[in-house]
From Swiss-Prot:
Coiled coil: none annotated. Transmembrane segments: none annotated. (6S)-5,6,7,8-tetrahydrofolate binds at S113, L114, L115, P116. It comes from Escherichia coli (strain SMS-3-5 / SECEC). The gene is fmt. This is Methionyl-tRNA formyltransferase.
Length: 315
């Protein structure tokens, strides 16, 4: 086996916890875990630990939860662990240059795209939103830029017509640990081959917002269908009817030319609610009114047919 490395792990959500779990089974020595401070969650706004903290405490690992790594005393926490490498997965804090240079082999990051495409905060969602044929994970050496470091290892996965951000998240949460363990072996053996990112191929994955997820009927049906999958499970595509938000869980594209204005309801039946768009027809299949569970178009029509009268326009 390769040399056992002393590793600091830094991460916060479930996606990161799956990588920590793989590390703990890999024969390497996780000497400390950094994660975001506990946050209020749920209706009672009770302070809740991150999935990474829960796993780390189960395994008896030292856990550190600084609000920032800029203060000298917090940087000293990293230095005192004398790590060979720091593994960063969806941590959520900026690592100052001093921290990046502390481990012997530096800091590496698992990023949810095939860099240099989709640097930034929402790579999984943006790959769907843009209609990419594939996505994947990139293990990269971290530097002070935003996802600009040299690439150490990549694994790809096709994007299917049924994928949502939720299903892609799960696929990449399986791929990421595989790539991470392989990269650590190469770093330990001295066989890693860093590859500089091609700046001419860079795209940026901007954060999602609830406002962006509001359905814009002037877009094409194909674009809107991709948005619905990209924004599932958050923030969820939505439209407004009688002042109420209605989430859209699933839709399909009907590739038919229509002269009706975008947003016009063309047909409402058990096969779906057909709406004119800027190009083509979007067939709404599964919706969720405020305060209700998601339901089929048929079930919603049974209770709210007046919302979907053909000829009316959706805002």
């Amino acid at each position: 086996m390769s040399e056992s490395l002393r590793i600091i792990f830094a991460g916060t959500p479930d996606f990161a916890a799956r990588h920590l779990d793989a590390l703990l089974s890999s024969g390497h020595n996780v000497v400390g875990v950094f994660t975001q401070p506990d946050r209020p969650a749920g209706r009672g706004k009770k302070l809740m630990p991150s999935p990474v903290k829960v796993l780390a405490e189960e395994k008896g690992l030292p856990v550190f939860q600084p609000v920032s790594l800029r203060p000298q005393e917090n940087q000293q926490l990293v230095a005192d662990l004398q790590a060979d490498v720091m593994v960063v997965v969806a941590y959520g804090l900026i690592l100052p240059k001093a921290v990046l240079e502390m481990p012997r082999l530096g800091c590496i990051n698992v990023h949810g795209s095939l860099l240099p495409r989709w640097r930034g905060a929402a790579p999984i969602q943006r790959s769907l939103w843009a209609g990419d044929a594939e996505t994947g994970v990139t293990i990269m050496q971290m530097d002070v830029g935003l996802d600009t470091g040299d690439m150490l290892y990549k694994l790809s996965s096709p994007i299917t017509a049924e994928d949502t951000s939720g299903t892609l998240y799960d696929k990449l949460a399986e791929l990421g640990p595989q790539g991470l363990i392989t990269t650590l072996k190469q770093l330990a053996d001295g066989t890693a081959k860093p590859e500089v990112q091609d700046e001419t191929l860079v795209t940026y994955a901007e954060k999602l917002s609830k406002e962006e997820a509001r359905i814009d009927w002037s877009l094409s049906a194909a674009q809107l269908e991709r948005c619905i999958r990209a924004f599932n499970p958050w923030p969820m595509s939505w439209l407004e009817i009688e002042g109420q938000p209605v989430k859209v869980w699933k839709a399909s594209v009907i590739d038919t030319v229509t002269k009706s204005a975008p947003g016009t309801i063309l047909e409402a039946s058990k096969q779906g609610i057909q709406v004119a768009t800027g190009d083509g027809i979007l067939n709404l299949l599964s919706l969720q009114p405020a305060g209700k569970k998601a339901m089929s178009a048929q079930d919603l029509l049974n209770s709210r047919r007046e919302w979907f009268v053909p000829g009316n326009r959706l805002a």
